[in-house]
Each structure stands twice: as structure tokens, then as C-alpha cells.
Amino acid sequence: MIPELGHFALILATVVALIQGVLPLTGTYLPSRTLQITLQSLARPMAILQCVLVACAFAALATAFLTNDFSVTYVAQHSNSLLPKPYQFAAVWGGHEGSLLLWVLLLAVWSMAVALFSKSLPLDMVARVLGVLGLISVGFLLFILITSNPFERLLPAALDGRDLNPLLQDPGLVIHPPMLYMGYVGMSVAFAFAVAALLSGRLDAAWARWSRPWTVIAWTFLTFGIGLGSWWAYYELGWGGWWFWDPVENASLMPWLVATALIHSLMVTEKRGSFKAWTVLLAIAAFSLSLLGTFLVRSGVLTSVHAFASDPKRGVFILVFLAVVVGSSLTLFAWRAPRVTLGGRMELVSRESFLLANSVLLVVATGAVLLGTIYPLIIDALNMGKLSVGPPYFNAVFAPLLVPTVFLMVPGSIARWREAKVSEIAYTLSFSGAAAVLLAIGLPFVLGGWSLGAMLGIFLGAWVGLGTLQQVVTRLRKPGRIGLSFWGQHIAHFGIAVFVVGVTGVNSYEVERDVRMHVNDVVTIEPYSFQLKSLGEVTGPNYKAVRADVEVKRGNEVIETLQPEKRRYFSSAMPMTEAGIDTGFMRDLYVSLGEPLNDARTEWSMRVYYKPFVPWLWGGVLLMVLGGLFAALDRRYRA
């Protein structure tokens, strides 16, 4: 009965979303002022009601998982009676249908948030924004009801379920998808504000100020989600990497890059009234790329640890939806673009010009990632053979574009609006620049050897970090209140600096050993030694594992005992690797257990890593997230 109620709630939510999308938008064009206000006023209660209904549907599906209702096909496919309760709940979004329901729920949450926290915005603007969000919700709700019903019954009911994919039985699964989806879906709010501004013809500083905090919050969630996904892959997959240029990883990176450009472009539009058309295009692109990521994951065109098995009609539905969203928004833009004024004048050297250059570089980098991601799919679709585009392409094309992007962050932060002097910028940054050069020359020798990549990475990290600290110190010396947006900007920029140093350190100075080990064997990565002390079997709630005890020493001092595992799950017999990791401020020590190399299972392949600066990757991400939260909470944006 509960699954049927959940399905009915989705049907009602679709009707409510249709009302939310059609009537308020219609009301903005009626001649009667009374009728205008009446229809526009429906937007807020409809958005709240839609969120309640979708939440009821989600709760119904969660109940089916937690009660082991294997008469529901989706539950039988993605859960098991032995699955621990936290993972039973996380399994709600462990497959295609449930993850799509989570997507729709979060879209409804964003809509309700706009309805509740935009009281100072004009009613017609709120009606347009919520109307656009309502129409987007209609598209996804119809997608669920037509192709992806999570409440479909299985008769007769299965005695037990197939179990959740062992890869996903991890605490990271409980957090990573919701955070990532909050970022993905949050781009719909920036898109809705852009479309609403185009519909009203009001592309001005007020629109940018209204849109910016929502964009920053979405960017913050997306940053956190991508960081969590990278961290999960690092410790869960057992290969020690944090980014593999997987197509679905790329699908999350592309909207992040465009959203980063959008945030800074919105700032220029708010402060100077410039870049209006460019800002609108970035908002459209950010959401369109989020939809493209949805298509890549759910169409079945990709083979990936992230991708969901899917039938072709789902891919066709999303592709048509993507075409409608992009086509209609670009058509509206083309209609309104001639009426958009150019805004304030700017010189070649100014804060606006630096921010424009950076946003263009970010868009070009996005294009490079997009090309490498979809080109193999196009070649395959045209029956021109199979083509793989991997890390060599992305590292060769993407990294050179990021070097000037990161470099321009510092002068772009201190340059004056409208017009700046090169000599003034150079003088202001002379100390930071000189210190960054000295660190870039000297530190590589201290860390383990000089290379061009290490020198360049350390220079960029030091340049941004020292330049950011210099700006903070300069501002603290001046009187007056410092807004949260100032702190947010500089904390996020410092996070970029920390992240760049982390990437440089691990890429330049990582040491890896692939070894064969018996009990009591020792492998050394100076100044650490790793001794295999014992091997034993352990039993978990739904798996058995071989666990190794690896004692790590520095000299004669025992640092830690790592316990990597090789697990086999009862329901699928799928082998899984659980790495043993010791994290310090400056490095990770990482041990991964491979396969037995003899019948007696006394000799095992093992992979041992020394990973300098890896914790700085996650620290940099957390600083960016903290900066985003500070910026979004600035009192200028409270409505």
C-alpha cells in the first residue's frame, strides 16, 4: 500500500508542478492587475506543496527499503536483508530510479527555498523564477512516471534482494550523491533567474544581486560533492588515485567550471552593470551541462563506475528534454539579446578585464573537457570505430589552460574597477611575486627533486596563497566593517592555493611500490618501512574478508598499523579492496591488498604508496566550501 501511495504522490506532484509552471508565468502577461497578482501568488504555495508531495514519495520508497519490501522491483534489485540499515537507506539512491527521485526531491527543495527566502523580491520575478523551476520539475517528474517508476511491483515478491553494489556500500555513498545532486540541481535556480530576467527584460544589477547567492550556494554544494566523490574513489577503489578523467567525473567538472565563471561574471554585472549577455549565457550553459551529465549517466552510452544501466528510451527522453531546455532558452536569449545594453565602460587593464579573461579561460577549459568526453561517443555513434580519450589528452590540454587562469586570480582580485595601472598592480604584488619565485626555486629540492611541473605548481600555489594573505592583511589595516563576502572570496581563493600545492606535491613526489609479500616481509619507502605482520579472515555483516596487518615504522618508531582488506560479499561474490591509510598533515601512507599469489594464500600482491600533500587536496576543497558558505551568507543577499 505504501508504494502505491508514493506513486500517487508523484502523480499529484506532477499536477502541482504543472500549475506552478503555467499559471504564475501566464499571470505575468495578463492585462488585469488583480488577476496578475492572483496567479503570480500561486507560485510560492505550489512550490511548497510540490516539495511536500515529492518528499512523501521519497519517504515511501525509503520505507520500502528499510522494511525489506522485496515486492518492489527497485528494492529487490538494490537491497538485501543482510545489508546494514544505513546502507539500506543510502540504497534508495543507489540505482537509476531512486537517484532520479532524489534529483526531483532536491529540485523541489530548491524551489521551496526560493519560495521561502525571497520575500523581498518583486512578486513578478519570484513568479517567473518559480514558474521556470516548475516546468523543469514537470519534465523530470514525467521522466520518472513514464520510464523510471521506482514503485513498480514485483509479483511474486522476491525472497531476498540482489544487494547493493558493493562499491557503494560505504559511508561516502550516504553523503556524496546528495551533495553532488544539490550542486547539479542548484544550477537550475541560476538558470531560472536568467530566464526570468530575459522574460522580464530586466537584466540589471538587481537581477545579478538576487541570483548570485543562489549560484554561490549551488557552486558550494557542487564543490563539496565533487570533493567527496574524489575522496571516496581515493580510499575505496584501491588504486590510490583521486581523479581519473572518467567521463562522469568530467560531467560534474564541466558545470563546476562554468559555475565558477558565472559567479565572477555575476559580480561584474552587479558592481558595474557589464557582461549581462555573457552572464546569461553562462547561467544557461551551467544548467545545460548539468543536464548533459544526467544524459551521460542515464542513457547507457557510458561504461563507468558512476553510470547506471539504462535502456535507450531513457536516454532519448533526457536528450529531448535537454534539447528543449537549451533550444528554448537560447531562442529567448537571441530574441532579447539586441535589447541588452553593454553596461559600464572598462579599460584593457581593469578588474573587469581580468575577470572576463578568467571566465573565458574557464569556458575554453570546459570546452576541452567536453570535447574529450563526447568525441569518443560521437565516433562510436557514427560507426567509425572505438576511440578512447584518457588522462594524456586531458593533462596535455586542460592543465595549460588552468595555469593562466590561476595566475590571473591575484591581479584580478586587487585591480581597480573600470581602470587600473599595470605599474600599480606590479608594485602591490612585488613582494608576493618575489616570495613565490623563491619558493618555487627552492622548495622542489627540499621535497625531493627539481622538475618544471613542480616548480610551476609551487609558484602558482604560493602566488595565490601569498597574494590572498596580502590582500587580507591590507584590508584588516583599514577601518570599517568587513563583509562575509570578502572573507568568503579570500578563503575560497586560499583553498585554491592549498589545492594547487596538493596536486603538485602528489603528482611530482608520489612513490609507489608493487610488491609480493609474505608475513614478516618488509618494503621500504624512505623514511618509512612497511612490514606485513599477519594475515587473517574477518566476517562483516554481509561479507567475508582477508585482512592484513601492516606495521609502519619511521626508524624504530611505530607510526601506525594499517589494515587493508580484500572483501567478498555474500550476495554477489564480488571482490572489493579496502585500503589501509594513515593520514598526516603533509602526507598519506597508503597500502592496498591485491590478490593471493599461491594456492596456500601465504603470498600476496600488495601496493604501497607514499603520497605527499594528498591531505592538502581535501583541505583545499574544504576551504573552498567554507568560502562559498561565507559568501552566500553575506547580509547583502539576505532577502
Predicted segment positions?
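Contiguous transmembrane helix-bundle modules in multi-pass membrane proteins
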Residues: M1-I37, C56, F70, I175, ...
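Short, aromatic-rich amphipathic segments at membrane interfaces
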Residues: A90-A91, N165-D170, D588-W616, G620
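Hydrophobic alpha-helical membrane-insertion segments
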Residues: L49-F65, L133-I146, L282-S290, N358-L370, ...
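Membrane-interfacial loop-to-helix junctions in multi-pass inner-membrane proteins
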Residues: S32-V54, L116-S137, L199-T220, W245, ...
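A conserved hydrophobic secondary-structure block that centers on an alpha-helix together
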Residues: I11-L25, Y29, S99-S230
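Soluble non-transmembrane domains of integral membrane proteins
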Residues: D514-R607
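Membrane-interface helix-loop-helix modules in multi-pass inner-membrane proteins
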Residues: A55-L130, L145-L164, I226-E270, G293-V316, ...
